[in-house]
UniProtKB/Swiss-Prot annotation:
Pfam families: EMC6. Residues 1-28, 72-89 are cytoplasmic. It comes from Xenopus laevis. This is ER membrane protein complex subunit 6. Residues 45-50, 107-110 are lumenal. It is a multi-pass membrane protein. Component of the ER membrane protein complex (EMC). InterPro entries: Emc6, EMC6-like. Belongs to the EMC6 family.
Length: 110
């Protein structure tokens, strides 16, 4: 009986400040990847549907990397897995389009 560890059952307490901090880190990652992938799409000269497909592929790759980084203990850092996949997706799209059109214009038009 000496080798039996006692587990404390009950509600799991989550720090709201830590949750907000983790959400801010996710938002920063999404914004950075959106800007970088938008610049890449503009330099590569991607247009119309290919440009949007490139954004969603880059966003999916980031989501996959975030899930791999959080590992099996994702509930230690987030309330649900949904923010890892969809958090900041639309806001990142606006950043992507901004960098995409700017660099496309600078490289291929002027």
């Amino acid at each position: 009986m000496a080798g039996v560890a006692l587990k404390r059952e009950g509600p799991q307490f989550i720090s709201e400040a830590a949750v907000r901090g983790n959400a801010a880190v996710l938002d920063y990652c999404r914004t950075s990847v959106s800007a970088l992938s938008g610049a890449t799409a503009g330099i590569l000269g991607l247009t119309s549907l290919y440009g949007f497909i490139f954004y969603f592929l880059a966003s999916f790759l980031l989501s996959l990397l975030l899930v791999l980084k959080s590992g099996r203990k994702w509930n230690k850092y987030f309330k649900s897995r949904k923010p890892l996949f969809t958090g900041g997706l639309v806001g990142g799209l606006f950043t992507y389009v901004l960098f995409w059109t700017f660099l496309y214009g600078m490289v291929h038009v002027y």
